[in-house]
């Protein structure tokens, strides 16, 4: 039986509140998420919420749903199939002029997600013990419109008069809670001191160099087009993931920044790139390839941009990424 829900909203004007302050007001110690956009010109939103009613995680060959009251439901079978079944249980009634996002699942899908659809070797050791699917049900959250300078409390509730009254009351309480915390954290600056100690690197320079040469040979022989070669560093620090996120957004502000607190672990990141987006019946991809340093002046920026566009290698790599993305989308 489908859960028929409607998005109920209350919108207020921003009065000198910053997104990071509003999130702190909701409670950084709670499980929650912050999806932060900073580009006002493109009309980006910031979304945030805490204390999700349900957390959805894979556990080897099953999907586990942990509810706010502590109860757990285990659904055996391919986690991707079970996730699709879970998603299909919801029906959200959309009104005209809705926000692009009015509720649903937010979180992280690891690289091993592909193993749910492809048969591939699986001989990489699991060094961190975090399962592939890590999602939260965002059914009560705040959406900040950076262009209109407003923020909206969104609550998914039953599609009934009783549901409407209850949801709007929760929306008002959400706004009140966020705003009450703002004064406490007003103009609070992140601690930029460094206390990290590197405990482990996944590769030495020699090991990493050998892998690079191996990849080059695979490309020359036509076995692969591209490999994203990464290295994991394990660092000991006394700071929380949110402290590190605050530093990251100061040092590397980007159009797409994210913070997830799952209780046992936190995920942070910052990216200039929107990989894939679905809007109604259209799918968009915007891969980025090639980089240049920033110039000291606007004229230097333009010159570096023209240099990048004229670089045959960079253009070829970008075309390859677009083709790969298009092929994947076509599947």
How would you label these PLM feature ranges?
Residues 1-331:
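Extended alpha-helical targeting/anchoring segments
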């Amino acid at each position: 039986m489908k859960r028929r829900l409607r998005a109920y909203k209350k919108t207020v004007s921003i009065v000198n509140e910053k997104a990071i302050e509003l999130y702190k007001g909701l409670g950084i110690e709670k499980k929650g998420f912050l999806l932060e956009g900073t580009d006002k010109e493109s009309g980006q939103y910031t979304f945030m919420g805490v204390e999700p009613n349900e957390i959805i995680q894979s556990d080897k060959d099953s999907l586990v749903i942990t509810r706010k009251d502590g109860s757990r439901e285990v659904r055996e079978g391919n986690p991707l199939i079970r996730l699709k079944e879970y998603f299909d249980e919801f029906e959200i009634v959309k009104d005209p002029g809705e926000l692009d996002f009015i509720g649903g699942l937010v979180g992280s899908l690891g690289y091993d997600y592909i193993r749910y659809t492809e048969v591939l070797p699986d001989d990489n050791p699991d060094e961190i013990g975090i399962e592939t699917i890590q999602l939260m049900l965002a059914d009560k959250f705040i959406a900040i419109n950076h262009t209109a300078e407003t923020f909206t409390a969104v609550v998914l509730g039953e599609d009934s008069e009783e549901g409407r009254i209850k949801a709007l009351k929760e929306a008002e309480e959400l706004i009140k809670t966020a705003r009450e915390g703002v004064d406490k954290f007003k103009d609070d600056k992140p601690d930029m001191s460094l206390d990290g100690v590197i405990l482990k690197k996944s590769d030495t320079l020699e090991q990493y160099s050998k892998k690079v040469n191996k990849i080059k040979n695979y490309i020359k022989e036509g076995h692969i087009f591209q490999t994203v070669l990464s290295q994991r560093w394990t660092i000991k620090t006394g700071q929380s993931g949110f402290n590190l996120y605050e530093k990251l957004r100061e040092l590397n502000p980007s159009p797409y920044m994210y913070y997830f607190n799952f209780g046992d672990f936190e995920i942070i990141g910052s990216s200039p790139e929107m990989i894939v987006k679905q809007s109604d019946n259209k799918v968009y991809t915007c891969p980025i390839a090639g980089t240049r340093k920033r110039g000291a002046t606007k004229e230097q920026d333009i010159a570096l941009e023209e240099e990048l566009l004229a670089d045959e290698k960079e253009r070829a790599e970008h075309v390859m990424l677009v083709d790969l993305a298009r092929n994947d989308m076509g599947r």
